Amino acid sequence: MGTDQHFANEEVEPGGFSIVHRVFEKTEVAHLIDSISTISDKNGVRSRNGVYAIRNLLTLSPVIRELAWSLNVRSMVEETLRGTALPVRATLFDKTPDANWLVPWHQDLTICVAARLEVPGYGPWTRKAGLWHVQPPTSVLEGMISARIHLDDCGEHNGALRLIPGTHRLGRLTTSQIAETVRTSASKSCDVEAGGVLLMRPLLLHASSAGSEASHRRVIHIDYASCELDGELCWATVSD
C-alpha cells in the first residue's frame, strides 16, 4: 500500500474530481494485473486480439471484490460521500493497438441493478453482459462517486481521460447542452501514474482520445453509491 494518500475533499466538491498519487505499490499493481488476466467468463469479457474490457468484475474476481471493499479505497470514497460507500459496479477498461477507441464527451448515466422492475423515474433500460442497466433519477447519480485505479502510466499518449471541471453540478445534460459546454469550457487531461487513483463524479463531463502509442492503458473503474434505490430495486451487487 502506498503512502501518498493525502487528498483534499474540497478538490472533489468544486471540480468533481481528485487525483490521488501512489495509492498502490508496484507489487500490488502487478497482483491486480495478474488477477484480471485469469478471468475467462465470456459473458463479461470483451476481446479483440486481447482483452480490452471486462464487466461484472465484482462478481468475476474475488481479488477485485476485495479491492473494492478495502479500506485503502473506501476511506477516500467515504470522505467524499460523507458516509458509508457501497461498491456497486466494477469494470476493466484497456486501450491497446487492436482496441484503441476514442470516447466522446458524455456523462455516466446508468447503474447496474439486480432485476428489471418498473419504478417511476428509472429508465430507459438496457441489457449488458447479462445484467440490467438503467438510468436512475439524477439524485441517485449525485450520491455516487467512481474510483479509477490505474494499472499503467496514463497520459495523453495512451488516451488519458479528459474532464471539464465543475460540470457535475450542471445536472443531467442534453446532447446540445453537452456540445455547447464543450465548446465554451476548458478541459483538463488527467495524467495518472500506475498505482494512482482518479476519483470522479459520474455526472462530470469526460472523454478520451485514442492512444497515439502502442501501449496498455488498463484502468479498474469502480462505482460507489451512498444510497439505496427506490421501490424494490436493488443494486446488482447486493441482491442476495
PLM regions and their residue ranges:
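Residue-level detector of conserved, well-ordered beta-strand and adjacent loop positions
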Residues: 21, 165, 201
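Non-heme Fe(II) oxygenase catalytic core, chiefly the N-lobe of the double-stranded beta-helix
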Residues: 2-15, 24-194, 207, 211-215, ...
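Glycine- and charge-enriched low-complexity intrinsically disordered segments
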Residues: 238-240
